[in-house]
């Protein structure tokens, strides 16, 4: 059973996050291992396994990039374990330049420039994210997979920039 079915939700990217949260709580109550403490060893093991599956499904569906990757996996694109990389050389060059810029910001300890950089990367991420949503809605799986690969780069860059921000603020 796929994670969307487990949560009683349609297999699409855009979800009702409130329904997801409520269903998670219901499933957790229903399959909590403590409810099966007096059951047989097989029942206890099944409850632990079901609880682990529910937790994994919850983690996957509540995080946008993980949800997109999972949805794509249901359509034959296993992005989590693939060796396929981004082949868009212009995008890769842009990423290298952004990484170099982030390194320069770190060396200069330039908080104002870092703030501007973070905003710019967030805007780039948001633009690509919107494109991915449209591609997934239109079932353009190949294009969506390529966009998700690019979003991973941007997500890592954003995370690195935010970590640098924390580091600079701690000085």
From Swiss-Prot:
Example GO biological process: protein complex oligomerization
InterPro entries: DnaJ_domain, HscB, HscB_C_sf, HscB_oligo_C, J_dom_sf
One Pfam family cited in the UniProt record for this chain: HSCB_C
Any single GO CC term annotated in Swiss-Prot or TrEMBL for this entry: iron-sulfur cluster transfer complex
Keywords: Chaperone
Domain (J) ranges: 2-74
GO molecular function, one term: protein-folding chaperone binding
Entries under NCBIfam families matching the protein: hscB, PRK05014.1
Role played: Co-chaperone involved in the maturation of iron-sulfur cluster-containing proteins. Seems to help targeting proteins to be folded toward HscA.
HAMAP family found in the cross-reference section: HscB (MF_00682)
Family: Belongs to the HscB family.
PANTHER family, per the entry: IRON-SULFUR CLUSTER CO-CHAPERONE PROTEIN HSCB
Complexes and interactors: Interacts with HscA and stimulates its ATPase activity. Interacts with IscU.
Protein name per Swiss-Prot or TrEMBL: Co-chaperone protein HscB
Organism: Escherichia coli O139:H28 (strain E24377A / ETEC)
Encoding gene, per UniProt annotation: hscB
């Amino acid at each position: 059973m796929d994670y969307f079915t487990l949560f009683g939700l349609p297999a699409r990217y855009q979800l009702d996050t409130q329904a997801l949260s409520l269903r998670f709580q219901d499933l957790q109550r229903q399959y909590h291992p403590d409810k099966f403490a007096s059951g047989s060893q097989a029942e206890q093991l099944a409850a632990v396994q079901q609880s682990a599956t529910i937790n994994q499904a919850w983690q996957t569906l509540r995080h946008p990039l993980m949800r997109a990757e999972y949805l794509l996996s249901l359509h034959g694109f296993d992005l989590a374990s693939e060796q396929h990389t981004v082949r868009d050389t212009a995008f890769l060059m842009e990423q290298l330049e952004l990484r170099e810029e982030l390194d320069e910001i770190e060396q200069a300890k330039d908080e104002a420039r870092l703030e501007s950089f973070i905003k710019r990367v967030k805007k780039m991420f948001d633009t690509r994210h919107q494109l991915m949503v449209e591609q997934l809605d239109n079932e353009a799986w190949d294009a969506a997979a390529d966009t998700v690969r690019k979003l991973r780069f941007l997500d890592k860059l954003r995370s690195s920039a935010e970590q640098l921000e924390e580091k600079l603020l701690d000085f």
